[in-house]
């Protein structure tokens, strides 16, 4: 058995004296593990960092076997990602989200979104927006998508500024006003069809994380006996600190 595919490194662990078991999210074969001979050595270490994209050749005698990988780097992002605390936490959290997908089950849409997310992860605010959208996409992929296009109460498609914490449906300004204190806020960057990242505030980011975090916890994590990863909290904290420093610099400058 053998195949070739594009992959993104999610994680690596040592195996024996010199090898490593590498976990990839691949475009056509889903989340897939394989043995990399020599993967524990210093020569391979830069390649096998989470967040890097690779071209993968997988071989095994039988399909159900672990198999062995031969990997070549295609986008070596890790060095840049490790240079910022928000990116370090973010990559770890993204990998934990990808592990919610069944092993060896293709999810090419999630693969494409993960690549786009990692390619635009340098700036803390933009990274936060990408990560929130990734969490939203994961909810959809796992069967718990939120309907943010139409007001769940009236059917209107304008002035959608709230989300019902019960149904996960959008709520318009007028329909939600009497219950505004009980509703979740829908940040503008999740309402825009073209996914433009302009026009957001620090509070919008926090609202976005509250929104996706609530439904991930209820529908995905708690049924598995899990909670949010420490990396998620670390990412949010790093983004908040970065935005505070940026605001202070803008005022003093």
Swiss-Prot record:
A single cellular component GO annotation: bacterial nucleoid
This protein's record includes keyword Ion transport: no
Cited Pfam families: RecO_C, RecO_N
Classification via Gene3D superfamilies: Nucleic acid-binding proteins, Recombination protein O, C-terminal domain
GO biological process: DNA recombination; double-strand break repair
Record key words, sorted: DNA damage, DNA recombination, DNA repair
Superkingdom to which the source organism belongs: Bacteria
InterPro entries in alphabetical order: ARFGAP/RecO, DNA_rep/recomb_RecO_N, NA-bd_OB-fold, RecO, RecO_C
Disulfide bonds listed in the record: none
UniProt cross-references to HAMAP family, sorted A to Z: RecO (MF_00201)
UniProt family annotation: Belongs to the RecO family.
Function: Involved in DNA repair and RecF pathway recombination.
Protein name: DNA repair protein RecO
Lineage: Bacteria, Pseudomonadati, Pseudomonadota, Alphaproteobacteria, Hyphomicrobiales
């Amino acid at each position: 058995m053998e195949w070739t595919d594009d992959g993104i490194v999610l994680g690596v662990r040592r195996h024996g004296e010199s090898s490593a078991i590498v976990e990839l999210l691949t475009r056509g074969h889903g989340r897939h593990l394989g043995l990399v001979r020599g993967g524990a050595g210093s020569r391979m270490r830069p390649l096998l960092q989470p967040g890097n994209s690779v071209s993968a050749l997988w071989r095994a005698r039988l399909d159900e076997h672990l198999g062995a990988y031969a990997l070549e780097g295609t986008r070596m992002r890790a060095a840049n990602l490790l240079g910022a605390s928000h990116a370090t936490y973010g990559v770890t959290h993204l990998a934990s989200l990808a592990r919610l997908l069944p092993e060896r089950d293709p999810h090419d849409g999630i693969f494409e979104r993960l690549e786009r997310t990692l390619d635009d992860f340098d700036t803390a605010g933009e990274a936060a927006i990408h990560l929130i959208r990734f969490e939203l996409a994961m909810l959809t992929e796992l069967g718990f998508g939120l309907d943010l296009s139409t007001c769940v109460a009236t059917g209107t498609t304008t002035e959608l500024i709230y989300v019902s914490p019960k149904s996960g449906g959008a709520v318009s300004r007028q329909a939600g006003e009497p219950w505004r204190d009980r509703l979740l806020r829908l940040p503008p960057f999740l309402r825009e069809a073209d996914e433009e990242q302009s026009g957001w505030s620090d509070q919008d980011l926090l609202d976005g994380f509250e929104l996706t975090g609530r439904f991930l916890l209820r529908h995905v994590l708690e049924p598995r006996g899990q909670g949010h990863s420490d990396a998620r909290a670390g990412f949010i904290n790093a983004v908040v600190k970065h935005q505070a420093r940026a605001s202070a610099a803008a005022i003093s400058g």
